[in-house]
């Protein structure tokens, strides 16, 4: 079974689940997981964890995201983006000057109410299903953080491109609506592309067409597109262990008086093979998660 991380450039009009379902057929395995759901209208970086690498989805060190989004002024929709039904229109009376003036107030930690058209669940029911039935319910605001917003110009009348660096759980649709409101305008998101997810960027991503072409060339070509699972953990210090310590890790046995500082480590064996994660506390080395089978 292939193991690694395949960074997909998600096409427009595909759900994240559509991409995973397609890759199950391409890779010949159901053991896949993805990180960071993208709306169907969005494109861009979607990390897909294959085989044993799927165990790393919940262990990622960096969940921050970067998006390139387009704000369109003049109308507000029920979904917060241009795929939704227009609820309200208004003449546009503000532009670039007003936009640049309000952006600084959106930088930093803040609370954000999830949109009705989202996968957040209330009493086990996804909000988007309630929204499709015309039902609106109260949602609790959640903590998010906007690290930076860069202005990228105006590609068309009343449209403005923004690059947003933010924490996990940020809804860009909601952010753009709030920016429009601060400008005294009605607004909606007309385009969205994720350019980075955690440690991975557009430069790491492959289109579905490229992945399908690699499949035609054989297993080696597919594996060449994948990043090693260790890439998720590169911010952690590296610990290279002796063979007897490696066996302790396989057996789940702690190693006492280990000569290294306390902390969390990514671990390789003497041959350079990535084994997994381990923690040292009080000089005792303990395995956290293994990504290899026992020898």
PLM segments and residue spans:
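Accessory RNA 3′-end/elbow-binding domains used by RNA modification enzymes
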Residues: 1-13, 17-34, 38, 42, ...
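Catalytic cores of RNA-modifying enzymes
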Residues: 1-167, 172-206
